[in-house]
Regions:
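Patatin-like phospholipase
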Residues: 2, 7-74, 79-438
């Protein structure tokens, strides 16, 4: 007698009881869903995120950053998650973005972002003669004061210094290779790249229904168009700029998608210059030399603005994380970010690419240190989602982000040692120059 026949011979109550449990069994999830949200932070932010993810992936059994369920990226974080969603691993990102030793077609060249926005300059410059004549006419007729008349010239100012058109072009080429796609709708996982509509101030979740017709590469370009640095990006007749203008993380996009575990990476934090300095993490697994860190005000306007910017975006993120905890009490949220007492990430230039190897190694080692110090709490939280700490990897103090895959030759070891010495020397000279200037 099959199940259908047996149900017909049951009483009414027995049939209702049996039917009640069938759909519940059918809808039971076979595995937890995991999402990743990456905040922005310029080249420095991307460098930190690559180094941190390399440490996380090798230290956490059961976590594969290329096989998550939902990816959310803002600004520089959009570049990283778009690559992960296309199957490019953190180690491959490290090879192309940090080490520059991948295939030429996949190597990131920072010069892409340093080309002047000639088109913007020309377009705005062509407006200048008419604006000048209009201002002079107002002054001559006494309609406006000199300062008021000069305000008419503001439309001639470029909206961005550099062109980020290469972001769209290069990433479109990168995602056109076999096994990858530049179409949100063809990805195996969900990908959301958040930009900000310049005219309305609303968030634009590219990749969500109604927003998924836009090429991934163009969405990355829009999400990373920092006002003043890059011109706004026009998509479907609307102008879009950096997604961080609205929120720092935008993790709620994935949390609303009912994920079980939310991993968030935030690369920019305000520096606590009053705390005892935390400088244990370093290149060769040894404590870094202690350095005298000047007060924020002693660094002049750039330092004050940097601290202000970091404090503003971090306070927004803290409020967002508190909201997530109350709004999604059954979800596990893990935040990874630099230590506020660590001067290494603070002293680095947010838009610098020169120190990428040193900073990526620092992020890698600091993340490993964080996992060791928080292993008790993290183990319990991660275990619910089938993820465990790899203690052998975490306890191996000789591991490095850029360690060669095989034993180097004598010449190779000499070159590696020389490179380390030169990196240390460059950092020492830069620090001395900063201290001397103050």
């Amino acid at each position: 007698m099959d199940r259908r026949t047996s149900l017909l011979h049951c009483s009414k109550n027995e049939r209702l009881h049996a039917l009640h449990f069938v759909p519940m069994h059918a809808n039971t999830k076979t595995r937890p869903t995991i999402a990743l949200a990456l905040a922005g932070g310029g080249p420095l932010g991307a460098i930190y995120e690559v180094g941190a993810m390399c440490a996380l992936e090798e230290s956490l059994n059961g976590l594969d950053f290329t096989k998550l369920d939902h990816y959310v990226g803002v600004s520089a974080g959009g570049f990283i998650v778009a690559s992960l969603a296309n199957g490019i691993s953190p180690r491959e990102l490290c090879a192309s973005f940090i080490e520059n030793d991948s295939e030429p077609s996949e190597t990131f060249d920072p010069s892409w972002l340093l080309k002047p926005a000639y088109g913007e300059f020309v377009r705005r410059g062509m407006m200048l003669p008419g604006l000048v004549l209009s201002a002079l006419w107002d002054i001559t007729l006494g309609r406006k004061s000199l300062m008021s008349a000069l305000e008419r010239l503001s439309p001639a100012l470029p909206t961005g210094v550099f062109s980020n058109a290469a972001v769209d072009t290069k990433m479109a080429q990168l995602f056109s290779r076999e096994g990858r796609t530049n179409d949100f709708r063809q990805l195996k996982a969900k990908l959301t790249l958040v930009a900000t509509n310049l005219d309305s101030g609303d968030s634009a979740p590219f990749g969500s229904p109604g927003w998924d017709h836009v090429p991934i590469s163009q969405a990355v370009q829009a999400s990373s168009a920092l006002p003043g640095l890059f011109p706004p990006v026009m998509i479907d007749g609307q102008y879009y700029v950096d997604g961080a203008l609205k929120k720092t993380m935008h993790a709620s996009v994935a949390l609303e998608d009912q994920v079980d575990l939310m991993i968030c990476l935030n690369p920019l934090v305000p520096f606590d210059a009053t705390a005892r300095q935390f400088t244990k993490v370093m290149q060769r697994g040894l404590p870094a030399p202690k350095r005298e860190i000047p007060r924020i005000v002693d660094g002049g306007l750039p330092s004050v603005l940097s601290q202000t910017f970091r404090s503003m975006i971090h306070s927004r993120m803290e409020l967002g994380m508190k909201h997530y905890t109350h709004a999604y009490p059954k979800k596990d949220i893990i935040l990874i970010e630099p230590d506020h007492r660590d001067p290494e990430m603070y002293l680095a230039n947010t838009f610098s690419y020169a120190q990428r190897r040193h900073l990526a190694e620092h992020a890698y080692q600091q993340t490993r240190q964080m996992l060791r110090s928080r292993k008790t709490g993290l183990s319990a939280k991660l275990a619910k989602h089938g993820i465990t700490l790899n203690h052998d990897v975490l306890d191996d103090h000789k591991r490095h982000l850029s360690a060669p895959p095989k034993a180097p030759t004598r010449i190779g070891r000499a070159i590696a040692t020389l490179q380390e010495v030169m990196d240390d020397l460059g950092e020492t000279v830069a620090t001395a120059a900063r201290l001397t200037a103050h």
